[in-house]
Curated annotation (Swiss-Prot):
Topology class, membrane: Single-pass membrane protein
Keywords for this protein: Chaperone, Coiled coil, Membrane, Mitochondrion, Mitochondrion inner membrane, Transmembrane, Transmembrane helix
Any GO BP: mitochondrial respiratory chain complex III assembly
This protein's name: Assembly factor cbp4
Transmembrane stretches, start-end: 7-29
Membership in a protein family: Belongs to the CBP4 family.
SS bonds (residue pairs): none
Subcellular localization, as worded in the UniProt entry: Mitochondrion inner membrane
Classification via Pfam families: CBP4
Chain spans, region Disordered: 88-116
Function, in words: Essential for the assembly of ubiquinol-cytochrome c reductase. It has a direct effect on the correct occurrence of the Rieske protein, core 4, core 5 and apocytochrome b.
Coiled-coil regions listed: 78-112
Any single GO CC term annotated in Swiss-Prot or TrEMBL for this entry: mitochondrial inner membrane
Gene from which the chain derives: cbp4
Length: 116
């Protein structure tokens, strides 16, 4: 066989692989509805209940990623800073709740002692 024939065969095989492979994968891949129908009824119910929550969480995550990417810093540093800020806020809230509980206990103690 001539060189041109070999090149044509290789070109044909390459096209079949490059076009046919992804087309075959797309053909055998099940759709979301088909996968959902394969779930057992409990999983279908839970999936329907949690779908909105998961969509909201994903949207919030994408929004945070967009905010972090606007920063000059690396996304990882921006995420770490936000996590540290949340930790500090949670600690402040815990301290505030502890102080409020302490004040309430003192008021209750004063009421009890004042009535006796």
């Amino acid at each position: 066989m001539s060189r041109a024939g070999t090149w044509m065969k290789m070109l044909g095989v390459g096209i079949v692989i490059c076009v046919g492979g992804p087309a075959f994968v797309q053909y055998i891949r099940p759709t979301d509805e088909e996968l959902f129908k394969r779930y057992n009824p409990d999983l279908q119910k839970r999936s329907l209940e949690e779908g909105d929550r998961r969509a909201r969480e994903f949207d919030e995550y994408v929004t945070r990623l967009k905010q972090w990417s606007k920063s000059d810093k690396s996304i990882w540093y921006a995420a770490q800073e936000q996590q540290e800020q949340k930790r500090v806020e949670a600690e402040v809230q815990r301290n505030q709740a502890r102080d409020d509980a302490k004040v309430q206990r003192e008021e209750m103690r004063k009421e009890l002692l004042g009535e006796k």
